[in-house]
Every structure is written in structure tokens, then in C-alpha cells.
Amino acid sequence: MSTKAKNLNQKSVGQVIGQFTKDWMSIVGLLGLMVVFTIISYIKFGEQYFLTWANWKNILLQASTVGIVALGQAIIMLTGAFDISLGRMVCLTSCIGGILMKNMGLPVAAAIPLMFLVGITIGSINGFLVSFIGVPPLVATLGTQYVCYGVAKLITQAVPIPNMPKAIAWLGRGYIGGEIPICAVIMVCLYVIAQLLLTYTKAGRNIFAVGGSSEAAFFSGINVKMYKFGTFILASITATFGSGSDVPSELCCRYQRSEL
């Protein structure tokens, strides 16, 4: 093999290593942190308290709502925007769902579509303000956040709504085979669907293009405003999924759900 061929081969290996580092270093670092915290927790609390499947089930249960909402936020951020109202959107849609099902006696099958309708309406307002009016995402979603919070507090009078119907409680406290939380399964399914859409569809690639350079995407024939608008709709849908798992996970609807 000639020296030139060897140099090309070495360069290609270096490129592969560099690409691997670029693509996977954040994931490797995250896994490393998980291992470190697991070891520290094991040393501090012992195996009987931390390294148990019961504890991992509880972690999955508690993290599912945040994980579902984070998916929608990530999709918006791919376009270069963000939405700080998603947590309060979860708050409002869960409170509305609780009132419809518990106070008004509406069947779960009828209440859930109305929850999605409310969430999509809020997402549409955010998307319209940011994409078509040109309001900065921070200003637009900050205002929407406080509107959602105020409406949720108004309609619930800051009082929890306990004892949700069993059908909706199954989403937040139900388990497959008594071991795997339903809400965690929903979260994983949503992530898989999002990965497939973003990787293998034209719309997904266009979302990345908009985030990379909105001007270049515009001159390439991509409707930048509509794609940004659409990501806010998708985020509102994931937030409503999160509210569906949040309502029964606490067995009540609370306007104080502001930590998201």
C-alpha cells in the first residue's frame, strides 16, 4: 500500500472517530453521570433502598411527565425557538380534564379529545405569535404561561380535584404486567415515533434545515413559518399527553403544577 493510500486510510479512521465523538459524546457523558450517581447512591443508601426495581419503577413514574413534555420542547428547539409555557399548559389541560371528568361527569373518551383541543389551541396561539407575527418566543410563551396559570387557578379555585375516574387513573398509575408503568411506555413510544419522523421523513429533515439556517431554508423553498408553527402544535400535543399522565399520577388536578 502506498504512503498516500495509508494517509487517506488514517484520515478516514480519524474522521470516523471524530464523527462518533460528535454524535455520541453527550450520550456517553450522560450514561457516565448515571453510573457515578448510581454508585454514590448505592454507597450512601445501600442496595435495599436504591438498586431495587420498585425504586426504578417510581423513578420512571415520576419522570414520565417531564420526559414527554421535554420531547415537545426539543422539537421546537430544533427550529431555533422555545416554549416556556409547556409546563403551565400541562397544568391547565390537566385541570380542565379533571373538571370535565370529575365535576361534570363527562366520560373519559369524551374528555380526552377536549383536553387535546385546548392544548392544540394554546400551541396554535404560541405558534401564530412567534411564526407569523414575529413576537420573540420568550415574550409570547411567557405571556401564555401566565394566562394558563391564571385560568387554571380560576377554574379550580386553587382546590385539588381528588379521586379521578379509574379509567384515567390507569394511565398514570397503571402497570403492564404489574411491573412496567403505562406512562413510561407512552413516553418511549412517543420518542420512537418522533425519532422516526425526524430522521426518515421530509418534514423532519426540513425541521432540522429551519433550525440550521432559516434564511437558507427559505431560499430552498421550505415554508419556514409553517414549520415553526407546526412544531408548536406538536409540542402542545406532547404537553397534553403529559397532562394525561399527570392527572392520575397525583390522583388529583392541581393548579400548583409549576415545577415543569
Feature map (PLM): residue ranges:
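Membrane-interfacial amphipathic/re-entrant helices at transmembrane-helix boundaries
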Residues: 2-68, 107-110
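Single transmembrane alpha-helix segments in multi-pass membrane proteins
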Residues: 32, 37-41, 52-104, 128-135
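Alpha-helical transmembrane segments within multi-pass membrane transporters and channels
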Residues: 105-145
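Hydrophobic alpha-helical segments embedded in the membrane of multi-pass proteins
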Residues: 63-73, 91-92, 121-124, 146, ...
